[in-house]
């Protein structure tokens, strides 16, 4: 029956199951590690990105996380609503102090010489790790709304350091 339906909102993240631990995120960018059999919380991390506001044209949502490892180091990456790329240690749930500034890279930077309204850009998909790079796309309006509408850049950052590597547009 129709009257039993439950509105789930805009939450669309897909959990990751890695080595017996389930990792997932909330719409507001919190990341958790759970025991998939019991639901017991192993750790949680809250970047508090909701305090930075949300994009003008997008509901509060963070679409997912990415797992990366080089065989020795393992990280979870998330691009937050607050325009941050965060590297989280999978064992501790703490930001990686060697990545960006204490685990955070400011995604409001590295757009080149363009000037635009920063509130008009966000991320419509989780980051993706390829080799030693973390790649993040952009979610923008599909048409020019303002004279200073943002570009739809794709950018790459070093998975170890968070250093900006390249931009495609």
What kind of feature is each model-predicted range?
Residues 8-26, 30, 57-84, 119-146, ...:
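Repeat-blade elements of multi-bladed beta-propeller folds
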């Amino acid at each position: 029956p129709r009257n039993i339906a439950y509105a789930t909102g805009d939450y669309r993240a897909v959990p990751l199951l890695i080595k017996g631990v389930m990792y997932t995120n909330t719409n507001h960018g919190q990341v958790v590690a759970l025991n998939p059999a019991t639901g017991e919380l192993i750790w949680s991390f809250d970047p508090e990105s909701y305090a930075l506001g949300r994009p003008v044209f997008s509901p509060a949502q963070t679409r997912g996380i990415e797992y990366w490892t080089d065989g020795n180091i393992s990280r979870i990456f998330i691009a937050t609503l607050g325009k941050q790329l965060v590297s989280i240690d999978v064992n501790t749930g703490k930001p990686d102090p060697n990545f960006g500034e204490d685990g955070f890279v400011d995604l409001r930077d590295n757009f080149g010489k363009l000037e635009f309204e920063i509130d008009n850009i966000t991320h419509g998909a989780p980051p993706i790790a390829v080799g030693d790079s973390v790649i993040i796309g952009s979610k923008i309006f599909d048409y020019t709304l303002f004279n200073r509408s943002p570009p739809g850049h794709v950018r790459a950052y070093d998975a170890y350091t968070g250093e900006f590597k390249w931009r495609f547009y």
